[in-house]
Amino acid sequence: MARYTGATCRLCRREGMKLFLKGDRCFTDKCAFVRRSYAPGQHGASKKKMSNYGIQLREKQKARRIYGILEGQFRTYYEKAEHMKGITGENLLKLLEMRLDNVVYRLGYGASRNEARQLVTHGHFLVNGKKVDICSYHVSMNDVITVCEKSRSSEKFKTFVENPKTLPKWLEANVDNYEGKVVAEPSREDIDVPVNETLIVELYSK
């Protein structure tokens, strides 16, 4: 599966805000954005007025980077969102939230979506009792996500039990059983990503 392999901190600097792509490090003074909050490159520190297209493009890039998705896959999600009932932009964010790697992150198993993606790829999770190692797997309401029995002795998952995360309303966790459950579809209020999805819709509608 294709993925971005460059410097993660450059992505935050390019978008002009913390995207929290490196988990706990983003909350420390080691965060590159704290030291250099301007865009990377020779002219990164200079201020330039952006066109409407540029603003829309940056919003789309920001969303892609938050969820760790390449352009082709992101457009596929958008096209699917267009054909769903409801508001296209909100549908897009809901589809992204219901990816297995994002649900694993929301449940608190990974400090970042990137870490959650690695945990899924390495086969640490079951969905409804069956192993799933595909990050883009779309979870549905009432799906149960469980840590594999053999993975539970890992310090990573022990931390989950000892320090459970506050969950969004659409998820529940049974910490003692190393499992989480999707109890509803996320509403727009439940999705705390700093993205204006209307700008993304405007971009793709051109």
Swiss-Prot record:
Keywords assigned: Ribonucleoprotein, Ribosomal protein, RNA-binding, rRNA-binding
Q: A single Gene Ontology molecular function, please?
A: structural constituent of ribosome
* GO CC list: small ribosomal subunit
Residue pairs linked by disulfide bridges in the UniProt entry = none
Q: PROSITE patterns annotated for this entry?
A: RIBOSOMAL_S4, S4
Which residue range or ranges hold the S4 RNA-binding domain?
Answer: 98-163
Q: Which GO terms describe its biological process?
A: ribosomal small subunit biogenesis; translation
Q: How does it assemble?
A: Part of the 30S ribosomal subunit. Contacts protein S5. The interaction surface between S4 and S5 is involved in control of translational fidelity.
Q: Matching NCBIfam families, A to Z?
A: PRK05327.1 (NF003717), rpsD_bact (TIGR01017)
Q: Family per UniProt?
A: Belongs to the universal ribosomal protein uS4 family.
HAMAP family linked to this entry:
Ribosomal_uS4_B
| Function of the protein | One of the primary rRNA binding proteins, it binds directly to 16S rRNA where it nucleates assembly of the body of the 30S subunit. With S5 and S12 plays an important role in translational accuracy.
| PANTHER family (alphabetical) | 30S 40S RIBOSOMAL PROTEIN, SMALL RIBOSOMAL SUBUNIT PROTEIN US4M
**The protein's name in its UniProt record:** Small ribosomal subunit protein uS4
Q: Which organism is it from?
A: Clostridium botulinum (strain Eklund 17B / Type B)
